[in-house]
């Protein structure tokens, strides 16, 4: 029960509440492991279907508590959805506010670390006397380019276009040569599309999250992204703290015998491994084109394909 997890007032306690895609969950897990190694008590919130995988990556440490949230529509991670329905998951996340508030009141943590989608969490945390921390799973250079208030400085009330995104926002570090090609800018336009009952864009959610939290944390260091971190700090007028790079521990799993034998049949570094992560789903056309391109190399290859769990596979 959550009441059994409440800690003594003198023990630093944080709650982790990432978005429900594993690309977001993983950095929160790595930060949890790092904080726990320094004596911080950690409680992790997620959907029930995600918990086995989360537990397996929390250094197998039972002292890190993982609590499941109930989702009204039964959809609990992006692997269960095709990309165009990801907004449904964000809406489902919005419906957990009462659960989250009850848990925070019972657990009484000092801080709650949250993700871009939970724009409502800073206000909720403030109501119960808890500081909120926006933990960005992205690089500072990308957040500084896309999700800062000055991004709309030159738009003057009209809708933003991909042409606007091809150039950096006003005040962006001058020594940077970063810009987006047209196809890259088009990919980011989804951030400015309204969806859900709240009719908010992804950009508005991120901006509210960053603007209302107590402080911001990035998984980087000054030596790598210093000018962009300074720019973000200036834009949001609040402290930006750094965790340093967060990477998982090297795997100790033994390779399956069938793959070990297959790989042993080729010279070292001669096999191509092609994988786009656990939550990228290619169309039939993309799969055929990709496989054809790999075959044209004349090299042996392993192509890893993923499909949403609720779709028929052919």
Swiss-Prot record:
InterPro entries according to UniProt: UDP-glycosyltransf_plant
GO molecular function: UDP-glucosyltransferase activity
Superkingdom of origin: Eukaryota
Regions that span the bilayer: none
SUPFAM superfamilies attached to this UniProt entry: UDP-Glycosyltransferase/glycogen phosphorylase
Tissues and organs where the protein is expressed, per its UniProt entry: Expressed in young leaves, flowers, pods and pod shells. Barely detected in seeds, roots and root nodules.
Residue runs in coiled coils: none
PANTHER family: GLYCOSYLTRANSFERASE, UDP-GLYCOSYLTRANSFERASE 79A6
Note: Flavonol glycosides (FGs) having rhamnose at the 6''-position of glucose or galactose that is bound to the 3-position of kaempferol are present in cv. Koganejiro, whereas FGs of cv. Kitakomachi are devoid of rhamnose. In contrast to cv. Koganejiro, FG2 of cv. Kitakomachi has a two-base deletion that generates a truncated polypeptide devoid of enzymatic activity.
Physiological role: Has no flavonol 3-O-glucoside (1->6) rhamnosyltransferase activity in vitro.
Protein name as annotated: Inactive UDP-glycosyltransferase 79A6
Organism of provenance: Glycine max (Soybean)
Gene this protein is translated from: FG2
């Amino acid at each position: 029960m959550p009441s059994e997890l409440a800690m003594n007032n003198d023990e630093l306690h944080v709650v982790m509440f990432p978005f429900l895609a594993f690309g977001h969950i993983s950095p929160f897990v790595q930060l949890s492991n790092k904080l726990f190694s320094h004596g911080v008590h950690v409680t992790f919130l997620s959907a029930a279907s995600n918990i086995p995988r989360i537990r397996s990556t929390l250094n197998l440490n039972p002292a890190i508590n993982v609590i499941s949230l109930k989702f009204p529509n039964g959809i609990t991670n992006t692997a269960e959805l095709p990309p165009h329905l990801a907004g449904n998951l964000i809406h489902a996340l919005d419906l957990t506010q009462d659960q989250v508030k009850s848990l925070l009141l019972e657990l009484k943590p000092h801080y709650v670390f949250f993700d871009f989608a939970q724009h409502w969490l800073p206000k909720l945390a403030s109501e119960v006397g808890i500081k909120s921390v926006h933990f960005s799973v992205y690089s500072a250079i990308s957040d500084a380019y896309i999700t800062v208030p000055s991004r709309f400085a030159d738009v003057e009330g009209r809708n933003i276009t991909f042409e606007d995104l091809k150039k950096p926002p006003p005040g962006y570090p001058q020594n940077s040569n970063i810009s987006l090609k047209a196809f890259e800018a088009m990919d980011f336009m989804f951030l400015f599309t309204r969806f859900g009952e709240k009719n908010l864009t992804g950009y508005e959610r991120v901006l509210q999250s960053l603007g209302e939290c107590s402080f911001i944390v990035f998984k980087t260091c000054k030596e790598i992204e210093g000018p962009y971190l300074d720019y973000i700090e200036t834009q949001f007028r609040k402290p930006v703290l750094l965790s340093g790079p967060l990477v998982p521990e090297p795997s100790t799993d033994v390779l399956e015998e069938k793959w070990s034998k297959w790989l042993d049949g080729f010279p070292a570094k001669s096999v191509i491994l092609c994988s786009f992560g656990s939550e990228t789903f290619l169309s039939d056309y993309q799969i055929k084109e990709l496989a054809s391109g790999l075959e044209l190399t004349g090299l042996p290859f392993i192509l890893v394909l993923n499909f949403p769990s609720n779709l028929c596979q052919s």
